[in-house]
Amino acid sequence: MLRRLLSTAALCALFLASVPVAQRVGAQATTACPQGLRKLDIGISVSPPNVVHTSPYVAKALGYFAKHCVDANIVEFNGGTVGTIVAAIQQGTAIGNLTDISIARGLKARQIWQLAPRPPQAYVVSADIKSAKDLKGKRLSAAGGGVGGFNWLMGREVLKTAKLGVDDAQFIAGDTAGRLPGLVAGQVDGVVLHPEDAHLALQQKPGTHVLVALSQLLPDFAFNAYGASEELIAKDPGLLRDVVASLIEADRTIYRDKARVIPIMVEATHKPRESVEYAYDVLTKNCIWAVNSGFNPKRTMWTYEHDIANGDLDASARKLTYDTIVDTSIAKEALKLVGGEQTINSCKD
């Protein structure tokens, strides 16, 4: 009898070990969430995501969304902060990357959590480009939105360091997935690449090199903030609080448990493990992911004022303050659910 009981216990243990974490936590959430799981779309700026964008994938795979009674549907958009992702936020069906530019142009929405307070990317160029002045007459990437998209904006910033303007180079539009292949194939001479893609570029095309890191080029630039419509914030702040709490837990796990999150990141990004691990090390070392709300008023307002100075917002645009860009209440309430503010390896945003 004892032997049969032990065998049964062993089989149960083996069964539990074989069930994915998210599935086990999801089953537990069924009883812990009397009203069921609440649905919300989580918009990702690019398809497939870069390593920096994988926090929602970690939150889902490790069961943090289910723990907070959220049924998160991750939706990948091809085009950064333009087009469909902005429309989804406006409709109140999703949260996603939201810029001050969209708000100033009339979108009734506010940022609720900063995924990545500072930019993780570098401007990567072909072998014959030795300095920014060599970009004159070259083909530069405008992937993910064309004119006004992130690659175009950052290309403009690099050109400015050599007293050049956007008319001094040829910008090539395309899908975000084509950023790395375009550089490797010689279709463009300069492009913004995330660390994992920069790692691959240097391997696949000898002589390719980093011209400048964006965090050095624009040290006060606020990179990626999740936003929600004002209607959704007013209608269901509890849902947004729980989503943000899930994401904060995911980011903290990213910093603390590399072995646990790397497989999730590899699956989400479709990138080689070696390149994902390289990116992970760069991102964690430089405190790219938020461990708390991610917000810093200085960064937010510098970015807004920079957009005005560059003409990205004209006189007709709505005038903004920090409080009209950011709703701080959601992240404040979320932090109460995850033990308050923390510092991990000197990272404290």
In which residue ranges do the predicted regions lie?
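Pocket-lining segment of extracytoplasmic ligand-binding domains
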Residues: 178-270
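Conserved C-terminal helix/tail region of periplasmic/extracytoplasmic solute-binding proteins
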Residues: 308-349
